[in-house]
Design a protein with these regions (language model features):
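Short, intrinsically disordered terminal tails adjacent to the first/last structured region
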Residues: 1, 206-215
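Hydrophobic, aromatic-enriched alpha-helical segments typical of multi-pass transmembrane helices
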Residues: 2-204
């Protein structure tokens, strides 16, 4: 019981630390634009605030890991929980395999660097994998709830479906103009869903204090 509630707190703290790290690191870099530059540039190889950037990415990974545990503990989900766990692993990959920004984070997303290598390829694959795992987790909750056989509430299925559509639409905008802005809105969408799931999964039944089951 306590571990599940604690997981919800860790998820919230992880998301807060992620955004604090992103905002703090961005302010410290001259010329960095939240509208035009990727978040991962802050953690890039060549970034003067790489430590803060990496810390932010790891905080996001911790939030996903905690939510995975909350879902597994509350609902015994053998599909959704592993998918969120996989998203946590993908987030960790982004922190470990950092993109090359030899001239620093500012403008890194807008310039083609000759130092692009296999590490950058792994980083890009990690971004794609993260989105796929999160989308799959959202759709798993949606399908399970709408079929009426899930331990989580039906409304969470509808909410997850809306967030899945938003995630897919927003991530498609992260390779055009104002990539930094779109990436932030996309991640805000995904992390908001994550916190909703963590919150619902850690709700207590007032009768016995156990995880509340909605089925």
């Amino acid at each position: 019981m306590t571990r599940s509630v604690g997981a919800g707190g860790v998820a919230l703290l992880g998301v807060m630390l992620f955004w604090a790290g992103v905002l703090g690191a961005g302010v410290l870099v001259s010329g960095y634009s939240a509208r035009e530059d990727y978040i991962s540039s802050l953690a890039g190889r060549g970034s003067q605030v790489a430590l803060l950037g990496v810390g932010a990415l790891l905080a996001s990974a911790a939030a996903h890991l905690a939510t995975s545990w909350a879902v597994l503990t509350a609902w015994r989900s053998r599909v959704c929980a592993p998918l969120i766990f996989a998203a946590a692993v993908a987030s960790t990959v982004l922190a470990v395999f950092r993109q090359s920004c030899p001239d620093g984070p500012a403008g890194c997303a807008r310039t083609d660097t000759p130092d692009d290598d296999w590490v950058d390829a792994v980083h890009r694959a990690g971004v794609g994998a993260y989105e796929l795992f999160v989308l799959a987790a959202m759709l798993t909750l949606a399908v399970g709830a709408l079929r009426g056989r899930a331990a989580w509430p039906r409304w969470l299925g509808v909410v997850s479906l809306v967030f899945a559509a938003g995630s897919l639409l927003l991530v498609s905008q992260t390779s055009g103009e104002q990539v930094g802005l779109w990436q932030r809105i996309w991640l805000a969408n995904n992390l908001a869903w994550l916190l909703i799931v963590a919150g619902v999964a850690t709700m207590r039944d007032p009768a016995d204090g156990r995880p509340h089951r909605f089925s």
